Amino acid sequence: MYSLLETELKNPVGPPTPAAGTGVPAAPGAAGKSGANPAGGANAGNGGSGGANGGGGGGGGGGSDQDRVKRPMNAFMVWSRGQRRKMALENPKMHNSEISKRLGADWKLLTDAEKRPFIDEAKRLRAVHMKEYPDYKYRPRRKTKTLLKKDKYSLPGGLLPPGAAAAAAAAAAAAAASSPVGVGQRLDTYTHVNGWANGAYSLVQEQLGYAQPPSMSSPPPPPALPQMHRYDMAGLQYSPMMPPGAQSYMNAAAAAAAASGYGGMAPSAAAAAAAAYGQQPATAAAAAAAAAAMSLGPMGSVVKSEPSSPPPAIASHSQRACLGDLRDMISMYLPPGGDAADAASPLPGGRLHGVHQHYQGAGTAVNGTVPLTHI
């Protein structure tokens, strides 16, 4: 074993052979780097070979490749020189990189006793190298291939002419700086998220706006705050099937709302509404609620009445038509002969009479609002 190593290592700095390269044609002075990749992986778990390779360097003070000083071989390189030649002779078509992979795997399978002679030889070569080149320092070459790859896979802006990307960026910055409403335009593009087209939401807000009475001297509210509308409570009609207590409570609430100006009524109309509900047992409560609501003052202007109130003549005509439809709907569910039994039976006739009185009183008291009889 040692005789074979001595014959192979007589000229460790001699010209390299093509088999000692790492997959590419070896340049002069590149034999020191042969098999370096598997050697690094193999020496990572081997303390002796790592120590043997610790003082290596890759470049001397010379400027050309011929004057460059090679690094001393480590234990793996010493072992792989003979093995690489043997494997290349056995498999002439095998690529050099595949040979290096197999050599690295075989080196890891060796035991420490089998690696010991190669580790000792690597230490001896390192000591000789340090004596010959005491001022040697490893200076790695610049990797030009990686830089070329980075330039090759650059951003798509590299496809443009040299000054096109910078000119486009400058034009975009100038346009953004000269536009004072750039932020507003960007915000307008997000109005589609809520289902409104650009500017449609503001148009709806303008249509829903209302004019305050001229008696109001307070300044208008800020436009940023959303306008909250309240609707006329007296316009909501309730079923006559409700118990008397609930009807009196709702009638009192409607009278209080009307007296406070929520429906846009005058105080005299509010008094008339309170008088219209005088037959209910909650007259005192309604009067107290109306007196308390009158103290609200200008808060009534915040409330919006129904905008679709028809004139009184049309309201009375539609009211009669709705009452006729309601009579037909109720008669559908009465037993056969219900029309003849209306006069004899007090219950259905009284019920319809109560419906007539309820809707007539509510319609005359509340600003001509159409009752919601279709509900």
UniProtKB/Swiss-Prot annotation:
Domain of life according to the entry: Eukaryota
Keywords assigned: Developmental protein, DNA-binding, Nucleus, Transcription, Transcription regulation
Tissue and organ distribution: Expressed in developing parathyroids of mouse embryos between 10.5 and 15.5 days post-coitum. Expressed in the developing central nervous system. Expressed in the developing urogenital ridge.
Keyword DNA-binding: yes
Biased composition (Low complexity): 19-41
GO molecular function: DNA binding; RNA polymerase II cis-regulatory region sequence-specific DNA binding
Gene Ontology BP, a term: sex determination
InterPro entries, per the entry: HMG_box_dom (IPR009071), HMG_box_dom_sf (IPR036910), SOX_fam (IPR022097), SRY-related_HMG-box_TF-like (IPR050140)
Region annotation (Disordered) ranges: 1-69
One GO cellular component, as annotated: nucleus
Role noted for this protein: Transcription factor required during the formation of the hypothalamo-pituitary axis. May function as a switch in neuronal development. Keeps neural cells undifferentiated by counteracting the activity of proneural proteins and suppresses neuronal differentiation. Required also within the pharyngeal epithelia for craniofacial morphogenesis. Controls a genetic switch in male development. Is necessary for initiating male sex determination by directing the development of supporting cell precursors (pre-Sertoli cells) as Sertoli rather than granulosa cells.
Record text on subunit structure and interactions: Interacts with SOX2 and FGFR1.
Protein name (Swiss-Prot/TrEMBL): Transcription factor SOX-3
Source organism of this protein record: Mus musculus (Mouse)
